[in-house]
Amino acid sequence: MGQKVHPIGIRLGITKDWNARWYADSKNYSDFLISDIEIRKELNEKLKHASVSQINIERVANGVRVTIHTARPGVVIGKKGEDIEKLKQALIAKTGMPVNINIEEIKKPELDAKLVAEGIAQQLEKRIQFRRAMKRAVSNAMRLGAQGIKVNVSGRLNGAEIARAEWYREGRVPLHTLRADIDYATFEADTTYGKIGVKVWIFKGEKLEKISMVSDDKKQSKGKKGRK
């Protein structure tokens, strides 16, 4: 039976970048990894309602640089920067190292898979019909420039006794094309009937143009050297 690979994991180094960027020897690797997990856990707990999509962690010299990608930067920063300062102090206490926090605003949350999945889950928790929630998310994404989107929900849909999965797709989502820029995320909705899983794939276009332009330039330069 064929198994499905993670759409982001297979594209790391091609169209996607790593969420954590640092180097460590074998002695410090496990400590850094556990520290990263604790930082993400702390931020996700304190920023539940801030529409956080991604947390990037970089380790430089003797400090940690954390970049938070959010659709609501004002909620993260707080009044006169009070909330972000509290976050910074909490992370310094947890890691024991200087921490620098940067905020990156997500201009189009309708094209972010994590935020779309979270939005659908919140609607399901409010007892909105799953088909309506799915179609609304799909139409918003396509209206704002997505080339394709697929949404999958699974569980006791509408309180049915037997769990099932249903999906809705518009446009194209080429999962086997590595140059395709596909955003993928999952989220869980806690309903009175149990958990409902939400998966979202968003295809934003292909990222081959820049790579091909560089390779063409290299070919031309090699050709000129050969003529000499």
UniProtKB/Swiss-Prot annotation:
GO terms for biological process: translation. One of its GO terms (molecular function) is structural constituent of ribosome. Pfam families: KH_2, Ribosomal_S3_C. Keywords: Ribonucleoprotein, Ribosomal protein, RNA-binding, rRNA-binding. SMART domains: KH. GO terms for cellular component: cytosolic small ribosomal subunit. The keyword Hydrolase does not apply. PROSITE patterns: KH_TYPE_2 (PS50823), RIBOSOMAL_S3 (PS00548). It comes from the Bacteria. Part of the 30S ribosomal subunit. Forms a tight complex with proteins S10 and S14. Binds the lower part of the 30S subunit head. Binds mRNA in the 70S ribosome, positioning it for translation. This is Small ribosomal subunit protein uS3. The gene is rpsC.
